[in-house]
Curated annotation (Swiss-Prot):
Places the protein is found: Nucleus
Any matching Pfam family: PAX
Taxonomy of the source species: Eukaryota, Metazoa, Chordata, Craniata, Vertebrata
Bias-annotated ranges (Low complexity): 343-353
PROSITE patterns membership: HOMEOBOX_1 (PS00027), HOMEOBOX_2 (PS50071), PAIRED_1 (PS00034), PAIRED_2 (PS51057)
The entry's keywords: Developmental protein, Differentiation, DNA-binding, Homeobox, Neurogenesis, Nucleus, Paired box, Transcription, Transcription regulation, Wnt signaling pathway
Protein name: Paired box protein Pax-3-A
Species of the source: Xenopus laevis
Designated gene of the protein: pax3-a
Region (Disordered): 165-225, 314-354
Amino acid sequence: MTSLAGAVPRMMRPCPGQNYPRTGFPLEVSTPLGQGRVNQLGGVFINGRPLPNHIRHKIVEMAHHGVRPCVISRQLRVSHGCVSKILCRYQETGSIRPGAIGGSKPKQVTTPEVEKKMEEFKRDNPGMFSWEIRDKLLKDGVCDRNTVPSVSSISRILRSKFGKGDEEDMELDRKEQEESEKRAKHSIDGILRERAPVSPESEEGSDIDSEPDLPLKRKQRRSRTTFTAEQLEELERAFERTHYPDIYTREELAQRAKLTEARVQVWFSNRRARWRKQAGANQLMAFNHLIPGAFPPAAMPALPTYQLSETSYQPTSIPQAVSDPSNTVHRPQPLPPSSVHQSSLPSNPESSSAYCLPSGRHGFSSYTDSFVPPSGPSNPMNPAIGNGLSPQVMGLLTNHGGVPHQPQTDYALSPLTGGLEPSTAVSASCSQRLEHMKSLDSLSTSQSYCPTYSTSGYSMEPVTGYQYPQYGQSAFHYLKPDIA
C-alpha cells in the first residue's frame, strides 16, 4: 500500500483476534466462556455460575461419610460458604440443585390431581402423617422431586379439606413434628426403599435431575468444651514451647490430655488470638508511659521545677564558628508586647541583645530566662539599660525569686553538633561581650545555659533590640507570675 509524499498514512484495520491458548496466567483459566477464575484455595470457579453437579455430589457424599465441612472445603478447593450452603439446602429439601439466580422462588401450586391423591391416601389411612403422604406420592409416581409438595403444604391442604378442630390440628402437628425429628426427611428407609423405578430414559437425562439420596445427620450445636486444670497446664506448657504445633505434636498432646486432635487445634488457635491481644495491649501501655510530658517518669529528676539535675553528656569540641562572637546569634524568648515594640533597628548584629537561656537537658522549656542587656544603648529612651542594671535587679532576674541554684556544668545547644556541649568557649564569648559592664561581673560565673546558633546554618536578619521598660521588674512578673 503506497501513499503520497507528505500525506498522513491511515491506520490499517486490525485483523481478527486469534484464539491463542491461555497459559501461564494464574488468575484466569481456559474455559469455553473465558470467565474462569481461581479462588484463594486454588479451585476453579466461574463468577455468577453455580458449581458443577459432580462437585455438589461429592460434597454431599463426603458429608454423609462424616467429613467436616472445613475439610471438604480444603480438599475440594471450594469456599466454606459454598459448602455450607449446599449442605444446608440438601438438609432442608433433599436436593442439590442450585437455587434461582436472582428474584424469589416461584410459589409451587399443587395440581387438583395431586390433591385428590392426597385425599384418597388420607381416607384409606386416617392416621397417615404428611411426610408419609409425600413419600407415597413419590413412590406411586404421582409427583417427582421437582413437583412434589412440601410437608407443610400437605398438612395445610389436608387441614382445609377435612376441617378438623384446632385442638386436633395442634395435636396432629405436634405428632408430625416429633415423628419428623425422629427420622430424617430423606433417609435411606424413607427414600431409597420406596423410590420408584427409574426408566432408562430418565437415566440418560442431565445429572442435575439425579440426587444423591444420602442421609445427613441433623446439625446440632456443640456445647463448649470445659478443660480441667491438668489439661490446661499441659496445653500451656506446649504453648510455651511453640505457638504452631504440627500434627504429630497435636496428636501426642491430645493423647496426654485425653482430648481430640481437633479440640487441641482449636485451643491453640484461640490461645494465639488471646496472646496477640495481650501483646498489643502491653505495647500500648509501654507507649502511654512516654506520653505524659513526653518522658518516662523515671527520667525526671526529683528537683525543683526550674532546676534540673546535672547531666552526663560527653564533652565534645565546639566549632570555631560558635566561639567567634561575630558569628553567633542568641535566640531570645518571647517578651511582653509592651517591651517588644521598638521604633528603631540596630545598626549591626552586635547591638542585638545577648540572652543566656537556662535550659534543661531535654531542650528548651518554659524556664525563667536570665536576660543580659545589649553592649550599647540601642534605646535612647532608656539609658539605664545601656549603663547596666543594678545588682539588686539582676539578682532578682538570676535567682528567680529565691530559688537556690545548684552547681552545674554549662552546656550550649549548637545546631552544628546536634547535642548539648560544655559551653567553655561560649562562656568566654559571653564574657567578651560583657567585659565592659562593671556591674555584671558576677554573671561570668553564673550557672546559665547559652544556646548559640551559628550563622553558617541560619540566615540572619537585623533583629529588633528587646528592651526592658522603665518600670523595672514588671517583665519578670509577666514571665513568671507563679514565682513570688
